[in-house]
Amino acid sequence: MTAAAPTLAQALDEATGQLTGAGITADAARADTRLLAAHACQVAPGDLDTCLAGPVPPRFWHYVRRRLTREPAERIVGHAYFMGHRFDLAPGVFVPKPETEEITRDAIARLEALVRRGTTAPLVVDLCAGPGTMAVTLARHVPAARVLGIELSQAAARAARRNARGTGARIVQGDARDAFPELSGTVDLVVTNPPYIPIGLRTSAPEVLEHDPPLALWAGEEGLGMIRAMERTAARLLAPGGVLLLEHGSYQLASVPALFRATGRWSHASSRPTCNDGCLTAVRNHTCAPPA
């Protein structure tokens, strides 16, 4: 008697075991196998359960073999999901990370609070916008906000503009250090996930070090080069009392707020750990002039 062909559900279990055996965490392995299977089935991940009792799609194991080399699942399928929204990627574009969802939720809450207090169109700027992850998500969740983003990489800026279609977010290609001079002193909220990995530090996963663009990762010997630049840009852009939310490394929980406090431009600057990294919250003071 011929044995029954394995179902997709059985293949998911087997693939998850292979990925965990290759050093990928169990949670990530489960999420990745579902993303790969959904792509192979040509359905959204949320609809994958309708396929589980059926046969294994021909491309599924090809995708799994690529993932076993530590190629990110998002690069294999060409898109990523962030806070439930799909973001198309492209070669050379930074893959959004789940830990950035925490800073994004914080930003949404702050924008919603501004709207409740009577700010009709709170202005938010996303520096180093990548594929538009934060900017587009903020525009979707707080449609009353005016959302602008800037990204240096031409490939990433193109991807961000595609992802922003229909959301109201506006993405420009350019250097975040010189962002939006016409808005100096008027912005309510700045968000940024700048490069912050020190040159030579190899603690990040192969998915990051070997597949994300170097422009989005490395930031000098201490990992503070772009953070210093973003401090100056945010201080210039923000209105007094405006807030900066900045993602940084877990190893920078002390050095980043110290850097901000030393400038005298912030009435508050503190960092908290997130699931894998850190997030700085800084409030622009009313007394110190913006940087020249």
Swiss-Prot record:
EC number(s) from the headed UniProt entry: 2.1.1.-
Superkingdom is Bacteria
Pathway membership, UniProt: Antibiotic biosynthesis
Task: Enumerate the catalysed reactions.
Answer: 4-amino-L-phenylalanine + S-adenosyl-L-methionine = 4-methylamino-L-phenylalanine + S-adenosyl-L-homocysteine + H(+); 4-methylamino-L-phenylalanine + S-adenosyl-L-methionine = 4-dimethylamino-L-phenylalanine + S-adenosyl-L-homocysteine + H(+)
Q: Per its record, what are the GO molecular function terms?
A: nucleic acid binding; protein methyltransferase activity
- The positions making up the signal sequence are none
A family per Pfam: PrmC_N
Q: Which residues cross the membrane?
A: none
Q: Does the record carry Repeat as a key word?
A: no
Q: What class of enzyme is it?
A: transferase
- Write out the entry's keywords from A to Z: Methyltransferase, S-adenosyl-L-methionine, Transferase
The question of whether S-adenosyl-L-methionine is a record keyword is answered with yes
Gene3D superfamilies in UniProt: DNA helicase RuvA subunit, C-terminal domain, Vaccinia Virus protein VP39
Q: Which sites bind S-adenosyl-L-methionine?
A: 128-132
GO annotation, biological process: biosynthetic process; methylation
Annotated family: Belongs to the protein N5-glutamine methyltransferase family.
Q: What does this protein do?
A: Involved in pristinamycin I biosynthesis. Catalyzes the SAM-dependent methylation of 4-amino-L-phenylalanine (PAPA) to 4-methylamino-L-phenylalanine (MMPAPA), and of MMPAPA to 4-dimethylamino-L-phenylalanine (DMPAPA).
**Protein's UniProt name:** 4-amino-L-phenylalanine/4-methylamino-L-phenylalanine methyltransferase
Give the species this sequence originates from.
Streptomyces pristinaespiralis
The gene coding this protein: papM
